[in-house]
Amino acid sequence: MRLRNIPDALERIQNQNLLVKTPWNIDDSWIIEIGMGKGKMISQLAFDNPNKNFLGVEKYPSAAVKSIKYVKKYNLSNFFILISDAKDLLDQIKGKANTIWLTFPDPWPKNRHYKRRLTYKDFLKIYANLLVKDGILKLKTDNLKFFEFSIESLKENGWKITYQTNDLHNSLVNSSNIKTTYEEKWVNLNYKIHYLEAIFI
């Protein structure tokens, strides 16, 4: 479904004091979600973990602005937004995070577009530079081929997969899983969600 353009989206995010100024300094209390969309999952994580800080990275202001309703619902003071493309993150963020989430990124299914996938080696280098030692990269996707590509890419580029499942909602970690808006849609259609955790070694 095409994202509806909201002309004043960036202004509305700024007015809520959610937009970070770059370069933004972080430390190991920070958790980052790349491609947060409407922010449902990360805002719930922020509410559940008030002693940690959360940064939602989203390329499109018209998607990110939707997170405002969750900020108000949970009265969050530990959640912020960065409007950025993933490839620019090392210029936008200074410091190292505890965890990076990749939630349902575009799988770019055509072979000629493989370098655009967020688990391609160039992006994995960025995440490695943004994570503390033993920091965790977490991936959720409904696309099996993309998941398999991601597993191979991680293994080939210095990462160790510490957990993986092809059925997140019937797995050991499901009890702590928070669904994204996109995830809820696919679960209702009985799609299986693939999930992994990895560290850079």
Swiss-Prot record:
Q: Name the positions where substrate binds.
A: 110, 142, 180-183
Does Transcription show up as a keyword for this record?
no
Example of a GO MF term: tRNA (guanine(46)-N7)-methyltransferase activity
Name the Pfam families on file. Methyltransf_4
Q: Which UniProt keywords apply?
A: Methyltransferase, S-adenosyl-L-methionine, Transferase, tRNA processing
Residues annotated as binding S-adenosyl-L-methionine are 33, 58, 85, 106
Pathway in which the depicted protein is active: tRNA modification; N(7)-methylguanine-tRNA biosynthesis
What general EC class does the enzyme of this chain belong to? transferase
Q: What is its EC number?
A: 2.1.1.33
The reactions it catalyses are: guanosine(46) in tRNA + S-adenosyl-L-methionine = N(7)-methylguanosine(46) in tRNA + S-adenosyl-L-homocysteine
What Gene Ontology terms describe where this protein resides (cellular component)? Answer: tRNA methyltransferase complex
In this protein, the active site sits at: 106
The organism's place on the tree of life at top rank:
Bacteria
Cited function: Catalyzes the formation of N(7)-methylguanine at position 46 (m7G46) in tRNA.
PANTHER family attached to this UniProt entry: 3-DEOXY-D-MANNO-OCTULOSONIC-ACID TRANSFERASE/TRNA GUANINE-N 7 - -METHYLTRANSFERASE, PENTACOTRIPEPTIDE-REPEAT REGION OF PRORP DOMAIN-CONTAINING PROTEIN
Family to which this protein belongs: Belongs to the class I-like SAM-binding methyltransferase superfamily. TrmB family.
Q: What is this protein called?
A: tRNA (guanine-N(7)-)-methyltransferase
Q: Which organism is it from?
A: Mesomycoplasma hyopneumoniae (strain 7448) (Mycoplasma hyopneumoniae)
